[in-house]
Amino acid sequence: MNSEHELRILDIDPKMIEEKVLALKGKKVQERTLQRRYTYNVIPLDRNKWVRLRTNGIKTTLAIKHVTGQGVSDTKEVETTVGDFETAAALMDEMGIKVNSYQENYRTIFELNGAEIMVDEWPLIPPYVEIEAGTPEIVNETIKLLGFNPSQATGLDVSSVYEQIYKIDIDHMSELKFDSVAKKLK
């Protein structure tokens, strides 16, 4: 598995991030787009390792993720592009690999100095920015360019952000969607 070099800054203002990136001569490479994903448990069950099938409507990927810690390089991933979201989901089902959850979020993507800057909006929690790059040094430098201190960053994965920061257990939710959350809040 390859190491990802990524950190998140929680509870951000998406407009401020966009203005800052563009002022630094970065570029927007993806408008705010709905991402849909199915997550699957691995066998044997390991809370820190899972399979993710994700699409943004244009590109669909299948990945296995393994979080080994909370540092900038502690997420391992193997990912490949697949042809179609629903067909890949049906294939997983036919292999006996059952969906753990269905999740949605919105993502806007920017590039700046070799880093990918992703503004993520998820149900029930404030937006956050994820910075991913080829090296931990580029990740930390980008955090500083955006006006943050690296000590403000976390290496927590999404599920851990929900659980440890916001006290919401999404690991046992069959779906995490904006419209279903809105219905529950009414």
What do these predicted regions represent?
Residues M1-E116, N149, A153-K186:
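N-terminal strand-loop-strand beta-hairpin
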Residues P14, V139-N140:
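Short, well-ordered alpha-helical microsegments
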Residues K65-V67, W122, G134:
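Surface loops and adjacent helix of pleckstrin homology
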Residues T68-G71, I125, E137:
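Short, surface-exposed beta-strand-loop junctions and turns on beta-sheet-rich folds
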Residues M118-P126:
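A contiguous pocket-lining binding segment that forms or flanks enzyme active sites
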Residues P136, T142-N149:
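A hydrophobic, small-residue-rich beta->alpha segment in the mid-to-C-terminal subdomain
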